[in-house]
Amino acid sequence: VNTGNHEFVDVLIVGAGLSGIGAACHIREELPRASFAILESRSVSGGTWDLFRYPRVRSDSDMYTLGYEFAPWLAEKSIADGADILRYIRETAETFGIADAIRYDRRAVRAEWSSVTSRWRVTIVHTDSHEESIIECGFLWGNTGYYRYDRGYRPEFPGEENFQGQFIHPQFWPEGFDAAGQRIVVIGSGATAMTLVPALATDAKQVTLLQRSPTYVAARPDLDVVAQFLMKRLPRKMAYRVIRWKNIFGSTLIYQLSRRRPEVVKEKLREAIVEALPAGFDVDRHFSPKYNPWDQRLCLITNGDLFEQISKGRVEVVTDTIDHFTVEGIVTSDGKIIQADVVVTATGLELQFLGGMDLVLDGEPCNLADHVAYKGIMVCGVPNLAMTFGYTNASWTLKADLTAHYVCRVLKAMKRRGATSVTPQSPDGALSDEPYIALSAGYITRAASQLPKQGLARPWRLYQNYFMDFWLFRLRGAGDHLEFGRASVRRDESKVVSS
């Protein structure tokens, strides 16, 4: 719709990755008469699953829960390769008629809310031409993930300028890289490092996993035998639902046990690692963190591949800090010399909310850190804005699907009331000191100043619990603690334009 000089859509979705495509599918199915567009800053869809190209990039959640609830995952592997996930996302977009709604090379950089018109005025930079344009929308929905695409977190190391080898950050993996015959050091202890190390060890001369402190890891097969059994004996859509709920129950049980009886989970994880590694391997030094399970995300080892490569002597684990770099490699704080041809800095991500978009409310800058999150989806005092942020203790898409259902319910409630704005109300009383994302990972703690706060009770508190959220988002009334309003001027939406 053209409103004078600017196009207007009912819902503007920012991001065409896993969350954004899912959000658009929900809009298409649940609000078929609503107009919408998807802005994507890159030239292709897929988000994370197109950006990351390092060897054996994969999910660290099973695809029966990382997949959309409305689009069954039918491939054989439960823990899928990145290329298969990307194909699944794009095929879903085609199946639901979403692909044509994506505006590529369009980065939303600024969104200005007007209470007079009940609209967001969004400034877009065309990343292919550096031109700017404007689009207006009734509802703005961020599906941008949680990290910067153009820059990963990369600490500076003493003496790194002396190193004569190659530095690589996994977020920007060089095309055609050949590990054959190379001595490779991977710095980091997160999911990326745990995936990369065994993948590189297949061809490299030697791979060293250099971590400042250990992470909890668990081995898991990439094939789910129960899922395969059900897929062969039930109609596929029914089997997918059963498997999905099975895995939701299983992951919730493990998480709750980790929080309530951490010593039990610690011991079980340790026992499994001791059994998988050679006698004499220092499991306590290299795989026994000081924190409790799920204070940081648990890392998945598919088919025990990391343990296998350690057992073969192709991977060495060093738990120590870096003292300095030399021409030929690294010297640790304990004086160990690690020679390297290539250093991979799997040191994390740089968190970014709403893709770095600036928000302005009636002419005043809006800092989300000054506001309280509502159901982890909307922001108190900020009208007609939603954000998709998945679970940190389970598959991202479980929360993304619930978020999409809830946003559609809110939009329907607005229509029933004849409202043009909806604003969550702030809680009475004190706020929680707990951050919006309750993990102690470095990339989260570094970005605390960007994130909304939590309240002390629902709907302003995040519980990271699918069953509680299912009740809150899908079964409970959609309008609790929401203020609905109407624009003071009538919208002129008479001219339809192509997108």
Stretches found by the model and what they are:
Residues Y54, A346-M414:
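Glycine/threonine-rich phosphate-binding loop and adjacent beta-strand/alpha-helix elements that clamp
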Residues V9, I13, L18-I102, Q211-R212, ...:
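Beta1-alpha1 glycine-rich phosphate/pyrophosphate-binding loop at the start
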Residues V14, I134-Y147, I184-I187, I330, ...:
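Short hydrophobic core segments
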Residues N5-F8, L12-I13, L18, G22-A23, ...:
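Rossmann-like dinucleotide-binding core of oxidoreductases
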Residues A276-Q339:
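Alpha/beta-hydrolase fold catalytic core
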Residues E76-R148, R314, H324-F325:
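Feature captures the FAD/FMN-dependent oxidoreductase FAD-binding
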Residues W73-E91, R103, I187, L257-K266, ...:
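Short beta-strand to alpha-helix junction loop
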Residues D401, H405-S499:
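C-terminal active-site-capping segments
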